[in-house]
Design a protein with these regions (language model features):
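Receiver (REC) domain active-site loop signature in two-component systems and cognate sites
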Residues: 70
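Active-site residues of response regulator receiver
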Residues: 67, 97
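Short, glycine/charged-rich "phosphate-handling" switch motifs in NTP-dependent
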Residues: 114
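Acidic, metal-coordinating helix/loop segments flanking the phosphotransfer/catalytic sites
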Residues: 28, 42-63
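C-terminal output helix
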Residues: 48, 121-134, 141-147
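His-Asp phosphorelay/catalytic-motif detector in bacterial-type signaling
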Residues: 10-11, 36-37, 59-63, 87-92
Length: 152
């Protein structure tokens, strides 16, 4: 989905899956600075995210920003569920984690993450990183609608 194809249809739906309220707030602020029409949804763990994704009353996200280390169902488990589900697998999933461990990167790509980005520690770098992700996935890339999409 590119901005062109969404401009007539409305908001870009972004699901942020992260158990750290501070990181969620930073992501929200970074996207708010864009002054574009985003609708942000949050889930504090993989269980809540999967409930959101499988709820036909909820909009289908155009992008999922996913932390790895969370309670109940971690990011790896959620990523595996999303990419195994024909109705969800076309949604781009960007792992946004504090971990720079090679095994985490390799495992995430093995589970079919679309990208793996290490969260910068510096505030300005964090904001810029989120905005680069937004530019690429919601401004440049054209994606097919997921089978069984909740929206037209």
């Amino acid at each position: 989905v590119s901005r062109d194809s969404k401009s007539a249809g409305g908001a870009f739906e972004v699901l942020i899956v992260d158990d750290d309220p501070g990181d969620v707030l930073l992501i929200e602020e970074a996207l708010a600075e864009r002054r574009l029409h985003h609708r942000l949804h949050t889930a504090g763990d993989g269980v809540l995210a999967l409930e959101f994704l499988r709820d036909s009353a909820q909009p289908r996200p155009d992008l999922i920003l996913l932390d790895l280390n969370m309670p109940r169902m971690n990011g790896r488990e959620l990523l595996g569920e999303v990419k195994a589900d024909p109705a969800l697998r076309a949604i781009p999933v960007v792992v946004l984690s504090t971990s720079a461990v090679t095994e985490d990167v390799t495992d995430s790509y093995g589970l079919r993450a679309n990208a793996y980005v290490t969260k910068p520690v510096d505030f300005d770098d964090f904001v810029a990183t989120v905005q680069h992700i937004d530019d690429f996935y919601l401004g440049v890339v054209r994606l097919p609608r997921s089978p069984g999409s909740h929206t037209a």
